[in-house]
């Protein structure tokens, strides 16, 4: 096995297990009692084994004990590996906590994620879609176009660590490459680490953020004390040499500033070519990390909504307009798209993006969607279609207002299958039917489940 476990802890017991199935987050599940060495008082107790796959016989070390279950980590594969086991592509896998499924075949990863979504829909809402759509897959392994990377200076060793947190730990593990990070970013990690190591103020740097647009790359340095002029100049020369945008952030988001602002505005850009729209964004703005999955997702959302020229669409949690602008293209100049987002800064960004694309039919409003918004004029105009793309907490507070919107079709984009299923149950009570659903492999090699679902109004219900 390729570095898929940390060093053993001698004080923790090791046992042999027969792995039966996978948990939702990709750990092997076994039970005590399947081997003669198991303690008799533990027979029947469930064990979650990191890196183990169904059908395998493994030796695992117990890492955590609770009343009803235990957690363990595989230390040795004792027989034939599962057909779904593959070699991890990253040399840091097993120590770095970023990925959790690199040892699982990509097809099986997607199958597992679909099972998770099916299970949650059944458990929380008692429903299944009429049709499961083909999963949206990532087209490349180095899919991440942005990353926050921790920085820690060890003065006794005069060594700077640039890397990600270890699994279930706040400790940073040093990395020299990242297999899921865009190659243009990953290839520069060693040189970036050496640069930070050379700075006088390296102990004051908390993290760096790398972001990639279609044609630009930004480096953001988060520092807790002011950097001297020599350090800033070193960072500037590095960025100039690479052709990158350089940003410094000494405090909160409002303190972000671009070095050498005369070279251009504080913006990166990406396009959704299928809709002929282009977006400008700041290094701190939320954007989808996987460009190819994002474009497929937006295309599918528009197809599911079956928009016609002149229709009205409401886009809740619209961000910088990732869905709103393509939707505006679909409804044409005689239609209307209303985007709503809590952040005033993101509303301004969406408004600016609509202007740069000449989409006058798109308008945006700032509103905390967890609070009552029924008194706002935009909420009482009626819509043909509704798109919801909430954070992990879901959109439960919004569900009570859905009947008032009058939408015939709803597309719900989710990053949490549990809250999607919960909200789906409410939509069914409001007379909607779950017609189609698909999982999206936005975060390949991780347990994160992204999904998209179509609901259609099938009957009138007096709420």
Curated annotation (Swiss-Prot):
One of its GO terms (biological process) is rRNA base methylation. Transmembrane segments: none annotated. One of its GO terms (molecular function) is rRNA (uridine-C5-)-methyltransferase activity. HAMAP family: 23SrRNA_methyltr_RlmD. Pfam families: TRAM, tRNA_U5-meth_tr. [4Fe-4S] cluster binds at residues 90, 96, 99, 178. This is 23S rRNA (uracil(1939)-C(5))-methyltransferase RlmD. The gene is rlmD. The keyword 4Fe-4S applies. S-adenosyl-L-methionine binds at residues 288, 317, 322, 341, 368, 389. Disulfide bonds: none annotated. Belongs to the class I-like SAM-binding methyltransferase superfamily. RNA M5U methyltransferase family. RlmD subfamily. Keywords: 4Fe-4S, Iron, Iron-sulfur, Metal-binding, Methyltransferase, rRNA processing, S-adenosyl-L-methionine, Transferase. It catalyses: uridine(1939) in 23S rRNA + S-adenosyl-L-methionine = 5-methyluridine(1939) in 23S rRNA + S-adenosyl-L-homocysteine + H(+). It comes from the Bacteria. Catalyzes the formation of 5-methyl-uridine at position 1939 (m5U1939) in 23S rRNA. The keyword Signal does not apply. Residues 6-76 form the TRAM domain. The active site is at residue 415. Its EC number is 2.1.1.190.
């Amino acid at each position: 096995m390729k570095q898929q476990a940390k060093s053993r802890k001698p004080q923790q017991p090791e046992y042999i297990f027969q792995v039966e199935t996978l948990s939702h987050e990709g750990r092997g599940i076994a039970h005590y009692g399947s081997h003669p060495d198991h303690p008799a008082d533990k027979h029947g107790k469930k064990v979650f084994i990191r890196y183990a796959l169904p059908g395998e016989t493994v030796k695992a070390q117990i890492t955590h004990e609770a009343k009803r279950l235990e957690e363990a980590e595989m230390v040795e594969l004792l027989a034939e590996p599962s057909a779904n086991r593959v070699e991890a592509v990253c040399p840091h896998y097993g120590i770095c906590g970023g990925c959790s499924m690199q040892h699982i075949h990509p097809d099986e990863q997607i199958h597992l994620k679909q099972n998770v979504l099916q299970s949650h829909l059944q458990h929380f809402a008692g429903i299944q879609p009429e049709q499961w759509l083909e999963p949206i897959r990532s087209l490349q392994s180095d899919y991440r176009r942005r990353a926050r990377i921790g920085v820690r200076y060890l003065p006794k060793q005069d060594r700077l660590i640039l890397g990600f947190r270890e699994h279930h730990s706040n400790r940073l593990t040093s990395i020299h490459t990242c297999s899921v990070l865009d190659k243009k970013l990953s290839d520069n990690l060693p040189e970036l680490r050496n640069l930070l190591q050379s700075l006088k103020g390296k102990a004051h740097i908390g993290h760096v953020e790398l972001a990639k647009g279609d044609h630009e790359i930004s480096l953001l340095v988060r520092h807790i004390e002011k950097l001297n002029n020599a350090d800033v100049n070193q960072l500037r020369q590095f960025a100039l040499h690479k052709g990158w945008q350089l940003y410094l952030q000494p405090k909160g988001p409002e303190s972000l500033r671009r070095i050498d602002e005369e070279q251009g505005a504080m913006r990166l850009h990406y396009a959704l070519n299928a809709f002929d729209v282009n977006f400008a964004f700041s290094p701190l703005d939320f954007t989808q990390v996987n460009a190819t999955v994002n474009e497929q997702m937006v295309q599918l959302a528009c197809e599911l909504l079956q928009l016609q020229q002149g229709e009205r669409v409401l886009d809740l949690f619209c961000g910088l307009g990732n869905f709103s602008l393509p939707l505006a293209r679909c409804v044409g100049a005689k239609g209307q798209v209303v985007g709503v987002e809590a952040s005033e800064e993101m509303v301004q960004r969406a408004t600016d993006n609509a202007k740069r694309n000449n989409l006058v039919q798109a308008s945006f409003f700032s509103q905390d969607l967890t609070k009552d918004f029924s008194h706002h004029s935009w909420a009482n105009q009626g819509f043909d279609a509704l798109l919801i793309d909430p954070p992990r907490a879901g959109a439960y507070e919004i569900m009570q207002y859905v009947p008032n919107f009058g939408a015939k079709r709803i597309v719900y984009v989710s990053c949490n299958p549990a809250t999607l299923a919960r909200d789906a149950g409410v939509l069914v009570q409001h007379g909607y039917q779950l017609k189609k659903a698909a999982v999206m492999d936005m975060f390949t090699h991780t347990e994160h489940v992204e999904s998209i679902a179509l609901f259609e109004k099938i009957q009138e219900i007096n709420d």
